[in-house]
């Protein structure tokens, strides 16, 4: 059974909050459905969001103000994060995990940080992904859902990322993108750039 309506409501609420407006980019499997304005028939386990590194303080402030902040979900507080570098934060809203991951653009390179927790992923890890020659405007778009303005990865970037996975849910999401349509030139350009994506 799909939980998409609940997921969509959470995304709309977060993007309506004064402290978070214009700061969030939705990047996960919900994007094809938000952009195409179609109902997802699959279960969505979480909401993936990237945030400019210098806006992460606003995210933490919002979570604390709304009793959503949990120290154990904040990467800065992890005992294995010795350098106390920000790799993002999770929170739980209406039973759904929402992940806020910081990104920055340095010398025309997109650097995204995130983390894995042993409880859910089987391993504790701090992850850095770099994509060269990509600006935020190359891989994002804006969509109006109802009355709410939402920033997301564009469909081309979502398709590229989904292709790197071989999960059934990603194949389903790619079908939605293909049915709606996307810019092949932009897609091919992003595909080339992400081929050199580095993980550490």
Regions found by a protein language model. Give the residues of each.
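Compositionally biased terminal segments of proteins
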Residues: 1-200
């Amino acid at each position: 059974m799909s939980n998409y309506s609940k997921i969509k409501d959470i995304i709309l609420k977060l993007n309506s909050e004064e402290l978070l407006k214009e700061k969030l980019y939705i990047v996960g499997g919900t994007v094809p459905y938000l952009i195409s304005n179609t109902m997802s028939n699959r279960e969505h386990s979480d909401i993936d969001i990237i945030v400019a590194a210098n806006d992460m303080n606003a995210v933490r402030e919002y979570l604390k103000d709304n009793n959503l902040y949990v120290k154990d979900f904040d990467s800065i507080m992890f005992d294995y994060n010795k350098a106390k570098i920000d790799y993002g934060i999770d929170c739980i809203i209406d039973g759904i995990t929402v992940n806020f991951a910081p990104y920055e653009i340095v010398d025309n390179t997109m650097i995204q940080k995130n983390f894995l927790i042993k409880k859910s992923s089987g391993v504790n890890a701090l992850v850095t992904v770099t994509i060269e020659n990509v600006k935020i405007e190359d891989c994002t778009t804006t969509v109006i859902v109802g009355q709410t303005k939402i920033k997301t990865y564009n469909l081309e970037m979502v398709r590229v990322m989904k292709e790197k996975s071989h999960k059934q849910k990603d194949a389903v999401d790619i079908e939605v993108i293909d049915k709606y349509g996307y810019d092949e030139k932009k897609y091919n350009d992003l595909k080339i750039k992400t081929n050199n994506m580095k993980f550490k």
